[in-house]
Amino acid sequence: MTLWLPTTGKVYLPPTPPVARVQSTDEYVERTNVFYHAMSDRLLTVGHPYFDVRSVNGGSIEVPKVSGNQYRAFRVTFPDPNRFALADMSVYNPEKERLVWACVGLEIGRGQPLGVGTSGHPLFNKVKDTENNSNYQGNSTDDRQNTSFDPKQVQMFVVGCVPCLGEHWDRALVCESERNNQAGKCPPLELKNTVIEDGDMFDIGFGNINNKALSVTKSDVSLDIVNETCKYPDFLTMANDVYGDACFFFARREQCYARHYFVRGGAVGDALPDAAVNQDHNFYLPAQSTQQQNNLANSTYFPTVSGSLVTSDAQLFNRPFWLRRAQGHNNGILWGNQMFITVADNTRNTNFTISVTSDGNAINEYNSQNIREFLRHVEEYQLSIILQLCKIPLKAEVLTQINAMNSGILEDWQLGFVPTPDNAVQDIYRYIDSKATKCPDAVQPKDKEDPFGKYTFWNVDLTEKLSLDLDQYPLGRKFIFQAGLQRRPRTIKSSVKVSKGTKRKRT
């Protein structure tokens, strides 16, 4: 029998107030036919690949940490186009428009040969190789070994006009009811979002985790990350950013495979269920009391990965990238006349080994006690960018969205809302710091605060390195050819007529 029943589900009505719609920059930004080329100098850095080398008293850093497994976060600044000496001042009307830069091309140049650099720890927490065993591992108080390995191979860069957002797992706050019952227990974890700064470590095969807070043994990972937080770009959050400023586009290439299989030392935190509650031998059968297997070994297994082959056939660098359509609403507009380029690349990860004598004298025979070995890592970068000059109309609906997105942009354009002064005449004392006059005002005018001043970046100033002569630079010539802007050479017709030979008649 078919019966009619009323709908039991809830009825959802649209919200009464209108929902604000974020416009794409293509809807209100007018692009011009003026292009500039910007190129940095060679950017070089040298340091120790595993840690900072400090002075004897520890007060200063003598050799900084420079690892191939670090992020390089470049903050590139450009001149203000509204104060720029344009060759053609009829490009825009300063009374009704403002100028901004748009990134249309980028090439991240990398010097130095390809190479694999290893990392490790002289006291690495590994009991034994668990892939090929000949005898059962017994109990011991310290089984740490001197171990090294090559990291996961990573090539990656993220381009935007605000810093790249990273994510990592960290210790979470314990609930109030469990705060006094945490001895010997695994702490709760939470996913945290932080800005990726220059010098932060990326994942090399042990995960994006805060090793400093979650590894009390200081021997679970290699030396270069044991006191660091490994971060990974939060592509999901940046892709869903309403304005799309953090990531115009990105390129990523990661590869690894499990090379060695080890097990940790120490007691197992989460015991096997059979040993804990005797669940009818669902996981294993106990050994006889006379066997070594009677004392169950550790089951905290982990691999050390390898990045495998490094080849020039799979390089993301030293090649141009053209931006036609960004993944978000911001199609390459550089708000604040700056661009953030976050790079991760360990395919040029060679660590130099430098040896000297302990006393500084020449040696005639080898003696390891009289030799000191040093490690150094070097990196070389060069940034080339193609900029397009764009115009923004000073309309109410456009300024409203820009003000909601970032009010500092309007202040830079000198379009801030100026309140009506309370009194046109102000008091100005000449000797304000003397004892004869009143104390100075407690609130002093503050300089404009840099929203990213608390972060560490590799600052690259290109305010005086822009050029209209695109054909004088490698990336500029590639852009001219790619955009079809090259001038075709005229065909020169020869005025000399070639006389035809006399054709013989057949007889």
Swiss-Prot record:
The keyword Disulfide bond applies. It comes from the Viruses. Forms an icosahedral capsid with a T=7 symmetry and a 50 nm diameter. The capsid is composed of 72 pentamers linked to each other by disulfide bonds and associated with L2 proteins. Binds to heparan sulfate proteoglycans on cell surface of basal layer keratinocytes to provide initial virion attachment. This binding mediates a conformational change in the virus capsid that facilitates efficient infection. The virion enters the host cell via endocytosis. During virus trafficking, L1 protein dissociates from the viral DNA and the genomic DNA is released to the host nucleus. InterPro entries: Capsid_L1_Papillomavir, Capsid_L1_sf_Papillomavir, dsDNA_vir_gr_I_capsid. One of its GO terms (molecular function) is structural molecule activity. Residues 132-147 have a biased composition (Polar residues). GO terms for biological process: endocytosis involved in viral entry into host cell; virion attachment to host cell. GO terms for cellular component: host cell nucleus; T=7 icosahedral viral capsid. Belongs to the papillomaviridae L1 protein family. It comes from Human papillomavirus 15. Keywords: Capsid protein, Disulfide bond, Host nucleus, Host-virus interaction, Late protein, T=7 icosahedral capsid protein, Viral attachment to host cell, Viral penetration into host cytoplasm, Virion, Virus endocytosis by host, Virus entry into host cell. Residues 122-147 are annotated as: Disordered. Its main location: virion. It is found in: Virion; Host nucleus. Self-assembles into homopentamers. The capsid has an icosahedral symmetry and consists of 72 capsomers, with each capsomer being a pentamer of L1. Interacts with the minor capsid protein L2; this interaction is necessary for viral genome encapsidation. Interacts with protein E2; this interaction enhances E2-dependent replication and transcription activation. This is Major capsid protein L1.
